[in-house]
């Protein structure tokens, strides 16, 4: 694997020994320390929107062919969903989805973007001759007012790492509840989160054991905190040891905001004899209102996307035999101090020929 992003978690054994990362008694919601909490309170929202003012992040997303071409295909191959409709593009960025909709015959598109990129989107819309069809509105969806009482279609690319990181989903649901006409559609309308297990000895050693000797100094006290940080990276499909299990499917057209916080059980069956160093989460997105169901996957056996996969390293190395099972549950919740962060509680057990263990780990995507 090649390193990319990070986040944060903690772990505790089921033998009641709890590790105190981020005040682990409330580790599903507490921050690392008081200074970090203050920084989060001051900068989290501003930093989030400011990050989308930079061209690099938009270049990465636009060059993600799986992502962008999927939306283009959905719109162009299913023009009946868009033609003569009023469309709301939530988190429009450069306005690419709005442009797709305008070209597909939308009556009007309202492109809402909170970052400074809104000004650039206006230029792009004008340069492409769609100023009469696309109106770019700069501001938060929760604060702006549309010039129309209702829209027929809401389209958004709201998904973050681990599907729910950055929590733009709540913004889409707010827009749906406020502006979507009865019988209107949300694109995409389904998103599913999955988990599997992988062998990853080389990278785990590089990420964790590295701290034992850093230029001749012992920094091993960092090891546990290092292992608590989920990694966003591309996983080789050959690393997968078990089958994959669905954690949750969310129906964006019907769900409530609170439904994005949940606990889901899982049972992973080993497909070969191997060692397990991490669990991996990924998601699929579906557009079920099309002539034929369309969508894409961010799984390790699919074409790579900028979302990659989210790797949750385990404190232990699990030795597993073909047919043995890892059972457990994953709890996912918004962080109370910064709702754009995601807190993860992972509990798992393996009762196998070579390994008998039960543990609970806490992670934070931040």
Swiss-Prot record:
Keyword Glycoprotein set for record: no
Protein keywords: Chromatin regulator, Cytoplasm, Methyltransferase, Nucleus, S-adenosyl-L-methionine, Transcription, Transcription regulation, Transferase
Principal localisation: nucleus
Gene Ontology CC entries for this record: cytoplasm; nucleus
Coiled-coil stretches: none
A GO molecular-function annotation: protein-arginine N-methyltransferase activity
Pfam families tied to this protein: Methyltransf_25 (PF13649), PRMT_C (PF22528)
Cellular localisation: Nucleus; Cytoplasm
Keyword Transcription regulation: yes
Subunit details: Interacts with FIB2 and PRMT11.
Protein family according to the UniProt entry: Belongs to the class I-like SAM-binding methyltransferase superfamily. Protein arginine N-methyltransferase family.
UniProt name for this protein: Probable protein arginine N-methyltransferase 1.2
Protein's gene: PRMT12
